[in-house]
Amino acid sequence: VKRKSAIIIGSGFGGLALGIRLQSLGFDTTILEKLDAPGGRAYQLHLGGFTFDMGPTVITVPHFIEELFALSRDAANLGAPDFPTGVVAAGRVREGLSGGPATSKYVQIVPILPFYRIYFHDGSFFDYDGDPQHTRDQIQALAPEDLAGYERFHDDARAIFERGFLQLGYTHFGDVGSMLRVVPDLLKLDAVRTLFSFARKYFTNPKMQQVFSFETLLVGGNPLKVPAIYAMIHFVEKTWGVHYAMGGTGALVRGFVRKFEELGGTIRYNAEVARIDVTDARGREPRGPLASRVARGVTLAGGERLAADVVVSNGDWANTYLKLIEGKHRRVNSDARVKLARQSMSLVVIYFGFRAEGLNLDLRHHNIILGPRYAELLTDIFDRKVLAPDFSQYLHIPTLTDPSLAPPEHHAAYTLVPVPHNGSGLNWAVVGPKLVERVLAFLDERGYIPGLRERLVVQHWVTPDYFERDLASHLGNAFGVEPILAQSAYFRPHNRSEDVKNLYLVGASAQPGAGTPSVMMSAKMTAREIARDFGIHASIANGAGRAPGEPKAESETVGV
């Protein structure tokens, strides 16, 4: 019996994770990647003997990764508990390998401590490591007036984590009713106010308000606008830690590619999709607004047509609907709706290698360097869309953990500066190089990397133009739609297209949102939707496989 076929557009974390899951569901899956190597935003750059992860660098919830590597052909395990009791109770690994036995066959994952060192503009810092007593000690030193507030924040963030992540994290909000059912809980938890406002309930010191609200910037969210449900990030990291893949995030990408191919999947590079092909139910051109619309495959930029029973976009939601599907096939995701959606911020990212001999580098693996303004800078980036005279940055130095990414006596680093997306109208060819020079001068002159400009060996940078041109992100956004309340849950793009049958979304633009754990959750949610829609036999969807072609009993259709 011929297996159903699937095409996934894009080989980011979402596309690779879903590819593995579709192979485990019994599909024959092809991933089409526009670039010359896998990863999408997680592309890896090799330059002058240095290796740089161009995108995600923070790994949390390692059991999500273990779950993928443990899958096998025709055994999707979608019916197993999403958060087994043992996984939650075991907590985080603090030393050695933090990947499970299946993961460790493909990639070595290790814990990082502290999670982040957060530098304030006055030179003081806070080591954020998830240890409650260490956190109390640092608050005592920096803001003793906020000790009692931390205890209340800790308890309330845990309640949000337990309800919002453990219980509701995998909820697919496909209709208004599914969202209305959870609103009372969110109101009770005070999780619909903004995250920054939530932090200010507990902390009076501006430094503590920043420490306990900044993390949504790592998933494209403005702390002044995202709902307080994101306070659960504190407890997600506290529960499972922050981790790193030896060899860089690219090593994890390669592990996913290897697993996908071992399960029989195919990945093609330099394969840009120009159009998602749509017909009516009879395979003809749809006529009129009431005609059915079914995804039948894709057409590549070179004209090649590929047929499939399922088409999934791991690309940007806005770009998918505006560029790949003709407007006449879209009613819900119309041009007007897509263009009115708020996109996340963009980034200027500087990748640089430098000589380390004789350098006493007092930095950590992950460093957050906050500028003199917090709320005002966020408003400049997200609302005014101007390039401010000041900036904050995330400085990543993986060679402190993994020297293999650079030649001996050298470091490979990148620093990421949040900036407005291309709705700003800024000419990045002009302002980009000037910002890069300011950022590198700051790191040098403020003593973070003394003598940096003389020590530089290689450098490369990207601006919002890279995200728009190379990654096909609408307006050059870096994280998909902005995760404000009005674009969350039901109001976030749906994993199953409302316009075209057999078309699905996965990744940062879909539910539940951006960030590596959310993207892997998105893959599982989309796999469940596909399993339901195609009546996948329960023995495949929920556990051990059956022989291809074995007839399914109606009562055994997946009910996850």
Predicted regions and their residues:
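N-terminal glycine-rich phosphate/pyrophosphate-binding loop and immediately adjacent elements
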Residues: 2-162
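Rossmann-like flavin
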Residues: 121-226
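A glycine-rich dinucleotide-binding beta-alpha-beta segment and adjacent secondary-structure elements
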Residues: 205-219, 390-396, 449-512
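Helical element adjacent to the flavin cofactor pocket in flavoenzyme catalytic cores
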Residues: 232-283, 295
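Mid-domain catalytic core of redox enzymes
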Residues: 274-285, 290-406, 547
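Active-site-proximal substrate-binding core of FAD-dependent oxidoreductases
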Residues: 278, 532-560
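C-terminal segments that line or cap access tunnels to active or ligand-binding sites in enzymes
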Residues: 355-464
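A conserved FAD-binding loop/helix module that cradles the flavin
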Residues: 510-530
